[in-house]
C-alpha cells in the first residue's frame, strides 16, 4: 500500500511505503485531506489438498476413513458427511432404481391380466349381441311372442341367478372354458329371445346404453380406486341423476303401470351398476392371473343383466299395451286383440 499525503503550504511532500516508516517535517493536521489508494490484491483461491480426491456425482470425498469430509454443493451452507454416508446414499439410490423396476414389472403383469379379462368379456358380449341379431332377423314373425307369453319375463332372472352362484362360490368357483361357455349359452339364448320380441330402435338404443354405462362405470372404477371421498362424490352425483330421471318419468303422461315398470327397472339398473363397479375394482386390484375367466364372466353377467333390464324397461310397457288391445300409433291392433274380437 502506498500512501501519499499532502499537507499545507508549510509542509513538504513526503513519500513512504509499507516497508519504511513515514517521516514528515510538519505535524499532521486534522484538516489535511488524506488520499488513500488501495490496490486490491487478487485473492488466491484455495487449492484442494494434495491428497487424491474422488468425485461422485458432484460430491468430493477423501479416502481418509477417520477425518474424511464430504462437501456437497448446495444452496446455503455446505453439508459435511462421512464417506460411509456417501456409500449408503449410493446404495439407497440403487435400491430405489431397483424398486421402480420391480414396480414397473408388477404394473406390466397387471396390464396383461386386464387385457385378458376384457378380451374375454368383449368376446362374450359380441357373441350374445350377434346371436340376438340373428334371431331378430331370422324370425320376424315372432314379434308377438313376448306379448302372448307373460311368463317369459321371468327369464330376466337368469343372469341374476348366475351372479348369485358366482358370488356364493367366490374364489372356489372354477375358472375354465367349460364354465365360460355354459354361462355364455344360458344368457345368450335368453337375450336372443328378448331381442326377437323388440323393435330395431329399441335394440340399438339398448346396445348403445349398455356399452356407454359399462365404459362409464369402468372409467369411474379406475378414477375412484380405493379413495372413499371420490366414491362419495360419485355416489352423490349418481343419486341426483337417478332422482331427476325418476321425477321426469313420474311426471309424464304414461299409464301408472308403465310408471311402475320404469321405476323398478331404474332401481334394478342402479343395483347392477353398483355390482359392475365392484367387479371392476376387483379386476383392477385383486385379479390373479389364474382367475381371469371368472372375473370376465362376472363382468359379462353384470352387463347382460343391465341389457335385459333396459330391454324390459323400453319394450315392457309396449308389450303390456299390445296385450290389452290398445291401438298403436298407426291405428292398428295386435294380432291377439284382433283374433279375440273376431
Swiss-Prot record:
Keywords: Glycoprotein, Late protein, Membrane, Transmembrane, Transmembrane helix. Residues 21-64 are annotated as: Disordered. Residues 36-48 have a biased composition (Basic residues). The keyword Aminoacyl-tRNA synthetase does not apply. One of its GO terms (cellular component) is membrane. It is found in: Membrane. The chain crosses the membrane at residues 119-139, 150-170, 177-197, 202-222, 231-251, 266-286, 296-316. Pfam families: Bax1-I. Glycans are attached at residues 149, 176, 330. It is a multi-pass membrane protein. Coiled coil: none annotated. Belongs to the cytomegalovirus US12 family. PANTHER family: BAX INHIBITOR-RELATED (PTHR23291), PROTEIN LIFEGUARD 4 (PTHR23291:SF50). This is Transmembrane protein HWLF3. It comes from Human cytomegalovirus (strain Towne). The lineage of its organism: Viruses, Duplodnaviria, Heunggongvirae, Peploviricota, Herviviricetes. The gene is US20.
Amino acid at each position: 500500500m502506498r500512501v501519499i499525503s499532502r499537507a499545507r503550504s508549510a509542509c513538504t511532500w513526503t513519500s513512504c511505503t509499507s516497508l519504511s516508516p513515514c517521516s514528515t517535517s510538519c505535524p499532521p493536521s486534522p484538516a489535511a485531506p488524506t488520499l488513500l489508494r488501495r490496490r486490491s490484491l487478487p485473492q488466491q483461491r484455495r487449492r484442494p489438498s494434495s491428497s487424491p480426491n474422488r468425485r461422485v456425482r458432484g460430491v468430493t470425498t477423501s479416502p481418509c476413513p477417520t477425518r474424511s469430509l464430504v462437501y456437497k454443493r448446495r444452496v446455503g451452507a455446505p453439508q459435511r458427511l462421512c464417506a460411509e454416508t456417501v456409500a449408503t446414499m449410493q446404495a439407497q439410490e440403487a435400491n430405489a432404481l431397483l424398486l421402480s423396476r420391480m414396480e414397473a414389472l408388477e404394473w406390466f403383469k397387471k396390464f396383461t391380466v386386464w387385457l385378458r379379462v376384457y378380451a374375454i368379456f368383449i368376446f362374450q358380449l359380441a357373441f350374445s349381441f350377434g346371436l340376438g341379431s340373428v334371431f331378430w332377423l331370422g324370425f320376424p314373425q315372432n314379434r308377438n311372442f313376448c306379448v302372448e307369453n307373460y311368463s317369459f319375463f321371468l327369464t330376466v332372472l337368469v343372469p341374476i341367478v348366475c351372479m348369485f352362484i358366482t358370488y356364493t362360490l367366490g374364489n372356489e368357483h372354477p375358472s375354465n372354458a367349460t364354465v365360460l361357455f355354459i354361462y355364455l349359452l344360458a344368457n345368450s339364448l335368453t337375450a336372443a329371445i328378448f331381442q326377437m320380441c323388440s323393435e330395431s330402435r329399441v335394440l340399438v338404443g339398448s346396445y348403445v346404453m349398455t356399452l356407454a354405462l359399462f365404459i362409464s362405470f369402468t372409467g369411474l372404477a379406475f378414477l375412484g380406486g380405493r379413495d372413499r371421498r371420490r366414491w362419495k362424490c360419485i355416489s352423490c352425483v349418481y343419486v341426483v341423476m337417478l332422482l331427476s330421471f325418476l321425477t321426469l318419468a313420474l311426471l309424464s303422461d304414461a299409464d301408472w303401470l308403465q310408471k311402475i315398470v320404469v321405476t323398478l327397472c331404474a332401481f334394478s339398473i342402479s343395483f347392477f351398476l353398483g355390482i359392475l363397479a365392484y367387479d371392476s375394482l376387483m379386476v383392477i386390484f385383486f385379479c390373479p392371473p389364474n382367475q381371469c375367466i371368472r372375473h370376465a364372466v362376472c363382468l359379462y353377467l353384470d352387463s347382460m343383466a343391465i341389457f335385459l333390464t333396459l330391454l324390459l324397461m323400453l319394450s315392457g310397457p309396449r308389450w303390456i299395451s299390445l296385450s290389452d288391445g290398445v291401438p298403436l300409433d298407426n291405428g292398428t291392433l295386435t294380432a291377439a286383440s284382433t283374433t279375440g274380437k273376431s
